Amino acid sequence: TAEYECARYIGISAQYLGGNDQVYLSAMRRHTELKYGENPYQSPSAMYADNRINPDPLGLDQFTQHKGHTLSYINATDLDRLINSITHIAAGFEKNFGNVPFIALGAKHSNSCGGAVGETAVQAIERMIEGDLRAIFGGVIIINAVIDVPEATAILKHKMDGENDRLLDAIIAGGITDEALAIIKRVKLRVLTNPALLTLSIDSLEQRSKLRPVRGGLLINPQPNFVLDLSAEEITGTGEINEQQKRDIILAWGIGSTSQ
């Protein structure tokens, strides 16, 4: 802890004396050891975090894990990408319609493989699954709602034949009840919650600079936080689009703009 604090204050001093754009230093605490890296042989692997100054309520270290195996590197990148996607969709709906619907997304290897909005959490979940019944197999699901028995049942059973539950790697939500946890039987299935998912808005977009390690250094770039505004003068087209088509456009934009 003392070494961490010293490193952090040395970094702040160097940035102040050298000019904020001339020096980049970062000190983070080890938050958790990951099950394995991007591939099983890439171990050890870990997640570091620093939320002591201007904490991010949607930071990966702010999620509580209720059951399942330890997160892997791919689980962490999937979660990060899903947070990026769901916050962009929420921002788009708030800007264009003044409210944020229930949003359900599924992802595999950091890209969405299903996405839907609904008037209820169950409706959003079922629509997301119905987009491609096979694509969600083994994937990660995120929903900006509290999961109770109806939501858990939809996630595990909707459009499934027989008694088997849908095979998933992780479920992420704003919260989950004990009753819902009780019907999630698969030991490996990771379940994580963060109440910040329940209050998504345009302010939920990532604000910190985007960092990318490159050989010999680091690239720093502002976050791509453009939010599509369908009323903007620059947007032109032929004919009129109805309200449902506008909602479809915002959903498609939110997913497409945050996919690799």
Q: What are these language model-derived features?
A:
Residues T1, E5-S259:
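ATP-dependent carboxylate/acyl-activation modules
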